[in-house]
Amino acid sequence: MKIFNDKQVWFVTGSQHLYGPQVLESVAQNSEEIIAGLNSSDDISVSIANKGTVKTPDEILAVCRAANNDPDCIGLMLWMHTFSPAKMWIAGLTQLNKPFLHLHTQFNAALPWDEIDMDFMNLNQSAHGCREFGFIGTRLNIERKVVVGHWQEPQVHRDIDDWCRAAIGVNAGQHLKVARFGDNMRQVAVTEGNKVSAQIQFGYEVNAYGLGELSDVVNSISDADVNHQLDKYACMYEMSPDLFNDSDLKKLMAQEARLELGMESFLKSVGAGAFTNTFENLTGLTNLPGLATQRLMAKGFGYGGEGDWKTAAMTHIMKVMGQGKPGGTSFMEDYTYNFGEKGQVLGAHMLEVCPTIAAAKPRLEVHRHTIGCRCDIPRLIFSGQSGEALNVSIIDLGDRFRMIVNVIDTVTPPQSLPHLPVAHALWEPQPNLNIAAAAWIHAGGAHHAVYSQAVTLPMLADYAEILGIEMVVIDNSTNLRQFKQELRNNGVYYRLG
């Protein structure tokens, strides 16, 4: 069973009647075998459905319209087995509103040198059939992914899956609702943005709800459900026995359990897969949710602190994209620096870092929260797993959205942090702190980000390409002067476009 077993990619083979029924029968058989091979690959996370060989403009238009109207279809994979005159594709492609991947492969890997004849040549024409098809994609100015290689190669499977996961992310965004509890943190700029523009570009809705509505649901959670939740905490996390033996501490734990259950119930009732809150708007709640928010993120909900709905949405989308991959995804903030031979960033937030990124079993503790609401709040404490990761920021530039991605290397802290009462990750930005921070600032990247060790750079590149949004990357190849010029060039391109 595939990871995303409720969605499909439609495989459509291009040809024409010119070649006769015998060749078309071979085309159909070869397509069946390729699809079976791709579906048998553990590297491909979405089922691929055979939608046959299209040979006329009407057949092409029909399959494109059918794809548009099928909610389970996240995109098309198109392959030209033979020559398929590309004017036949104009009507279909101009009406297609799903993304497509152009698979540039052929059925056989090697040429049968001793047997090759013109029948073989006329059957296996993807080398020039795909070029004809490629022209019309370019002529129509359609963004698409082109995967080149033999269909049995593992790298081809991985390239296909990157695109599949990007298409899944686009689909997730089109069905996402973000719930806002309270407004943005006062006077903060980068967390603002045009919600109408975001819905047009990404598909997700951003809706505000009163804290009174939320607190009513939170307060309705029964003591029995709270106690059951506390039992779960005891099984899942390291903790001091005092959390349950001390009556005051247990009361705080019960408050947090009630917040988690109430928030989850409310979010599900309004169909929201992501949410925001802010420490400046907590009327009716006992405290800023800590453990509650961390656990909701671990369940797949997106989160953005201080009203940051763009990061909340992207956190959920990337959690969906990364399903089944090693590593986790979390809301994150660049918090403080460690300047030295290798400049490092200690990332954290006041409370809300997702335990899916933890290097070891998280520890549940209660500490004083000193920003906004001053009270004791339960939270999970851990360090992030070492290894390569990404920080991703989506910003609203007025005329467009920009995605900024920094490739980073997460490392184990050289010493314990006994007095730091929050979850955290320590990383070394690529290519180094000086260039990465300067590039991030020049690009306008937010102080919040989506941190992920599950989602890859190719997935995000495909995601940005499908949506037609700007993407800039900061990694080991970044040269600051060239990066600044790229930003200038992009500004001209998107304004003229």
UniProtKB/Swiss-Prot annotation:
What is written in the cofactor note of this entry?
Answer: Binds 1 Mn(2+) ion per subunit.
PANTHER family per the UniProt record, alphabetical? L-ARABINOSE ISOMERASE
What cofactor is this protein dependent on? Mn(2+)
Q: Does the record carry Isomerase as a key word?
A: yes
The UniProt similarity line reads:
Belongs to the arabinose isomerase family.
What is its pathway?
Carbohydrate degradation; L-arabinose degradation via L-ribulose; D-xylulose 5-phosphate from L-arabinose (bacterial route): step 1/3
EC class of the enzyme, as a word = isomerase
Protein's job = Catalyzes the conversion of L-arabinose to L-ribulose.
**Keywords of this entry:** Arabinose catabolism, Carbohydrate metabolism, Isomerase, Manganese, Metal-binding
InterPro entries (alphabetical): Ara_Isoase_C, AraA_central, AraA_N, AraA_N_sf, Fuc/Ara_isomerase_C, Fucose_isomerase_N/cen_sf, Lara_isomerase
| Encoding gene (name) | araA
UniProt xrefs under Pfam families: AraA_central (PF24856), AraA_N (PF02610), Arabinose_Iso_C (PF11762)
Instruction: Please spell out the taxonomic lineage of the organism that makes this protein.
Output: Bacteria, Pseudomonadati, Pseudomonadota, Gammaproteobacteria, Vibrionales
Positions contributing to Mn(2+) binding: E306, E333, H349, H448
Protein name (database record):
L-arabinose isomerase
Gene Ontology MF, one: L-arabinose isomerase activity
What this protein catalyses is: beta-L-arabinopyranose = L-ribulose
GO CC terms on record? Answer: cytosol
Q: Which HAMAP family match?
A: Arabinose_Isome
EC number in record: 5.3.1.4
Tell me the GO BP annotations in alphabetical order: L-arabinose catabolic process to xylulose 5-phosphate
